[in-house]
């Protein structure tokens, strides 16, 4: 007796179809699972056996062979528990084979209840694209899977395998889950307000420029100057996620197993702040199942690295590929996977090991060589990929008491959204399909977009030769200047835009490189 059901697996960021075949034949009672299963899939036989008996069904006392096709692709995780149980029931004659356009996902508990699984959204998207009309998933995954619903596919939530069997038999139909309307606007309310930050006008301006153009920022200052406060408030002035960005971000969080139960799409821009002891694998991702790392979990959001020089050199060098390409490739013996990693880097560091080099009132206890060694932990190639560098001085007493209120996140957001609207109109032209903001311009696009006045061009030439800028630094200065001009509503880059952009860049090269 033979039966086949449809399910799905994960390969990197995308799902792929899997046929779960069950064959029951004569011979000694045994269960064999083939088709490159990992240990979690091999263990599913015991879960299915116990769940099937606890649900009141009969376990066939014959030889059972399960094949997961295609057989040349590794199958991972407990997602095949539910289709495996249904395949055994169908092959043993206890259940009519489900329609070919029906698919199943879910982990089984020993009592037959269904537990949520990771990666449901990419698998559901593949199911919808592959012509599946009915997708049965654990109830906790239903809201997420429903985001893949089109005009054809319906998502059916189930708390137990018995509910799925009864629905297939027509005894007790399951109502489909409908997708929740996408509304990212309320995500801003979850982020602290810039009005809480006292003083630091230069750093606040840098954060507005960063948000308006998607630029990377380095904040340098003594402890207590507000570096972390500024970084944590950046998502509150960024534009809302588009639905496309929300789907991509949700896929990453779903694969990583970090989606809350019952949640649909991620609506807030991610903010990730790994500890400085994080390894290169924690940042890049990896493991036996190619889990996304912090670089990918920060996709479409902010990656905040506090105490930047305290990270290992190996961990910091991992950042170079995603900062340049917007993606990161994880390679292991079992294969490789590429994840999107288009994040904004906000890094913070003290000026020296003790934190008080150059402080107006506190004495620094570090020797010049110790200061040099501390700062040299951040490599030149990484610094070259950071657009804005700001030195932050201690906040004065008068700025804490009696000063005029700082601009709120809502006020700063208006400036950012106005500049982003200019960029959206500019990059709607053919040839800019992959560009959403100024920071994503390629070298060739920079030449076409960043037109300057003659005086600004002369200034850039002199700065290029005097500061010894690299070609990459030259392009990044122009991108920042383009953002500053957009914030001011200027069509051409003038001297003011270029001088402000150079101010951030020159400070980085002169003060941090020895």
Where do the PLM segments sit?
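Peripheral, non-AAA+ core regions of ATP-driven protein-machinery
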Residues: 1-218, 222, 228, 331, ...
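Conserved inter-motif catalytic segment of the P-loop NTP-binding fold
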Residues: 245-279, 286-287, 434-444, 471, ...
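Walker B catalytic acidic pair
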Residues: 300, 306-307, 318
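Conserved alpha-helical scaffold flanking the Walker A/P-loop in AAA+ ATPase domains
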Residues: 208, 265, 270, 280-303, ...
